[in-house]
């Protein structure tokens, strides 16, 4: 899937004539309003299929688009596409301005506190709000036996204790998540070459 970029997800039918509600993961309205070829990946599919976008409109207050796809004429057909992804080819991405980023490129970057050089965690999601927020999973300082997880290539939650009486004691603590405003004052550096984001957090932000 590295050659594809998700631009939205079909969340529900709209009406009775095959229209679809799409929650966007792209900031470019033309992805949903300008007719042309798109790609569709339904749950369970390995490869996307080509589809034709006929029209689309933004729904104020809902944060989503209603689109019409060629060949989808009934609510039943639309329902069958629920949870499908709308995609574009990676090469179709427009050139961005300075300090603009594509969401998929930010996921997985390591977040570092510029003030002390310590690693905070990894970006796991972007939350779209008045100011966009980086959702960061903090690195736990209490995670036991990290080398064991790496050697077995299994996440810690998949490892089971043979001693059922000690199972709860040996479990890793749940990961903590924090939200970091994605603004220049707090996130001055995004370095894709090193796969890091440097932040200058205000007091208390990373302790929440």
UniProtKB/Swiss-Prot annotation:
Locations listed in the record: Cytoplasm
InterPro entries referenced in this protein's UniProt entry, alphabetically: PRC_barrel-like_sf, PRC_RimM, RimM, RimM_N, RimM_N_sf, Transl_B-barrel_sf
Region annotated Disordered, chain positions: 154-174
Domain PRC barrel: start-end pairs: 98-205
GO cellular component, one term: ribosome
Source organism superkingdom: Bacteria
Keywords, comma-separated and alphabetical: Chaperone, Cytoplasm, Ribosome biogenesis, rRNA processing
Main subcellular location: cytoplasm
GO molecular function: ribosome binding
Pfam family, one: PRC_RimM
Oligomer and partners: Binds ribosomal protein uS19.
Function as written in the Swiss-Prot or TrEMBL entry: An accessory protein needed during the final step in the assembly of 30S ribosomal subunit, possibly for assembly of the head region. Essential for efficient processing of 16S rRNA. May be needed both before and after RbfA during the maturation of 16S rRNA. It has affinity for free ribosomal 30S subunits but not for 70S ribosomes.
Domain-related comment: The PRC barrel domain binds ribosomal protein uS19.
Family: Belongs to the RimM family.
Record-given protein name: Ribosome maturation factor RimM
Upper classification of the organism: Bacteria, Bacillati, Cyanobacteriota, Cyanophyceae, Oscillatoriophycideae
